[in-house]
């Protein structure tokens, strides 16, 4: 694994590059208030099993960043995602690109489908926010009522981000956890519907990958994602 920086407008973000083959690259987007270290176990497994290279970024305000995450907007994090994707295309011009996002990172990955073309989309417990939240400072986002609107089918059916999902031309996989405290089944069901996605169900799991699930269940979870990525 190599540590590197991705240049953005006027600053840079940290990233880890897992080197596999040159023909496939996976962009990995972590969740809110998380970091690239949290993605190491799953990413290492996918690199070993599929032969893909992988780039794991760390948003501004996360990890060792000097910025305050609460003073950053999701829109700024999305520009960082764009910069990372474009770095991949520059460094691996002939590679098949896949994107895997977890929770907030899943929300970012879905935003990316509007602006960049890629082959595979993996959404692990993907979050969703109100349209105005995308341009709000994180400190102004009402996180106390997130689950309420994520369970609201009218909200989900009218959300512009989901309305344009059908234009995505690649494959999609949605991973959902039975006991998720933050992303309810209504949200993951809607993502499955709009992307015509395959799905993987983690019975008894809460939101975080770091659960009390038995080791064999964790291995099955990782293998399911790996096997899906290896499909053509």
Describe the residue ranges of each PLM region.
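Catalytic histidine-centered segment of alpha/beta-hydrolase-like enzymes
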Residues: 205-218
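Alpha/beta-hydrolase active-site loop
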Residues: 38, 72-91
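Hydrolase active-site cap/lid region
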Residues: 111-151
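The serine-hydrolase catalytic nucleophile loop
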Residues: 32-45, 186
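Short beta-strand/loop motif that positions the catalytic acidic residue
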Residues: 168-169, 174-176, 180
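N-terminal cap/lid segment of alpha/beta-hydrolase-fold proteins
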Residues: 1-19
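Conserved alpha/beta-hydrolase "acid-adjacent" motif
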Residues: 181-187
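Conserved alpha/beta-hydrolase
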Residues: 47-66
